[in-house]
Amino acid sequence: MKELIEYRVNLMKRLEDVAKAFRAECLSVKDPYTPLEGESWNVHQIAVHTRDVDKLVYGLRVHRTALEDNPEFSSFDGEAYMAEHYDPKESLSALLNDFVSSIEALVELLRGLPAEGWSRLSRHTTLGSGLTLQTWVEKSLAHIQEHLETVKKANNK
């Protein structure tokens, strides 16, 4: 049990750290509207997408799994959502600060959970059943990390 607790504490720290690193990396890009090589989006679009997926997908799934009995989630089409909701005029700094604040609030929720809260179950229309709250936290971290690496590559050109 000690190792599991340590893993979860580390997971929360990594989630906060990667969110802050993502913000810093995005803000260090000279022109966030320049298309990225090999990518369909620019840094501003990636930042908006990452913030929206935190709020509408992984963050929401963590919250609902913590509060509801075995909630069911449907798939999220990030491309379609961006096509309909993307605002290129949205301040990059403001949206990234909003993103980091959202992650910090999520971590506060996680810190307040009893150990068994991390094992609460949920379902997904295509992924099936038995998905724990911890699974959604891990997927959130992986999603942010993936986009952080993309932005880092753009910065290291």
What do these predicted ranges mean?
Residues 5-16, 40, 44, 89-96, ...:
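Amphipathic, non-membrane alpha-helical segments in soluble helical-bundle scaffolds
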Residues 14, 18, 23-27, 81-119:
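Acidic/histidine-rich alpha-helical segments that form the ligand environment
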Residues 1-10, 56-99, 157:
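Short, helix-capping/interhelical loops that line the mouth of catalytic, cofactor-
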Residues 12, 107-110, 138, 145:
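Generic N-terminal initiation segments characterized by hydrophobic and/or small/turn-forming residues
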Residues 32-78, 122-157:
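Short, contiguous alpha-helical
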Residues 3-31, 53-64, 139-142:
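Alpha-helical bundle segments that constitute or directly flank the non-heme di-iron/ferroxidase center
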